[in-house]
Swiss-Prot record:
Residues 47-77 are annotated as: Disordered. Signal peptide: none annotated. Part of the 50S ribosomal subunit. Keywords: Ribonucleoprotein, Ribosomal protein, RNA-binding, rRNA-binding. This is Large ribosomal subunit protein uL4. GO terms for cellular component: ribonucleoprotein complex; ribosome. One of its GO terms (molecular function) is structural constituent of ribosome. One of its GO terms (biological process) is translation. The keyword Ribonucleoprotein applies.
Length: 216
């Protein structure tokens, strides 16, 4: 299938070929949800920690004798029922990440791309190079009316990244960093012509069994 190539000036720059295998698949909401959950789990710092009964400071002496006081028996002031006691089954420092099958990650990315195209929110740009002023880029984006936009390029252009850095609602990623979560978080997905070729190679590589990483 073919799609028009646009410019940042809302002009036309020809057509690009979109592989139906990657852009016309039936979006799988369940698969995308699994990939997003996996990405967000990997992002968690996992630095949460509370002290248990064996870690809080305090005496290890028995508070009072076992029998004869009329009180409930107690063995330690560090027990969780006391104000200064340790927590029971509290959070510990750990890694929340887990493995997800490469084929599932690939299908999730294909589903996200296909969903954006089906919604009419996928745009192919000729290039983003040459725009290095924030004010200039802001004017262009307002005319295009894309809303919150994710721009995917083969390699992030430094000038464009610098121009977009101070604008709310526009993010730039290289092909290797394109991921389901960021695609779904934005209204419009804009892929440069070079980025489109890189994305095809990346998906072809996953299909062939090459090592692949998804930014999380």
């Amino acid at each position: 299938m073919q799609i028009d190539i646009s410019t940042l000036d809302a002009g036309s720059a020809g057509k690009a070929e979109l592989p139906e295998e990657y852009f016309a698949a039936t979006p799988r909401a369940d698969i995308m949800a699994r990939v997003v959950h996996w990405q967000l789990a990997k992002r968690r710092a996992g630095t949460h920690k509370v002290k248990g009964m064996g870690e809080v400071s305090g005496t290890t002496k028995k508070p009072y004798r076992q029998k004869g006081t009329g009180n409930a028996r107690q063995g330690s002031l560090r027990a969780p029922q006391f104000r200064t006691g340790g927590a029971v089954h509290g959070p510990v420092v750990r890694d929340h990440g887990y493995s997800l099958n490469k084929k599932v990650r690939r299908l999730g990315l294909i589903s996200a791309l296909s969903q954006k195209l089906a919604e009419g929110k996928l745009v192919v740009l000729d290039t983003v190079a040459g725009v290095s002023k924030t004010s200039e880029l802001n004017v262009k984006l307002k005319k295009l009316g894309w809303g919150r936009t994710l721009v995917v390029d083969a390699v992030v252009d430094e000038g464009f990244a610098r121009a977009s850095r101070n604008l709310i609602g526009i993010d730039v990623l290289p092909v290797v960093g394109a991921n389901v979560y960021d695609i779904l978080q934005h209204d419009t997905l804009a892929i440069t012509a070079a980025g489109l070729e890189g994305l095809k190679r990346r998906l072809d590589g996953i299909k062939a069994g090459a090592n692949e990483e998804i930014a999380a």
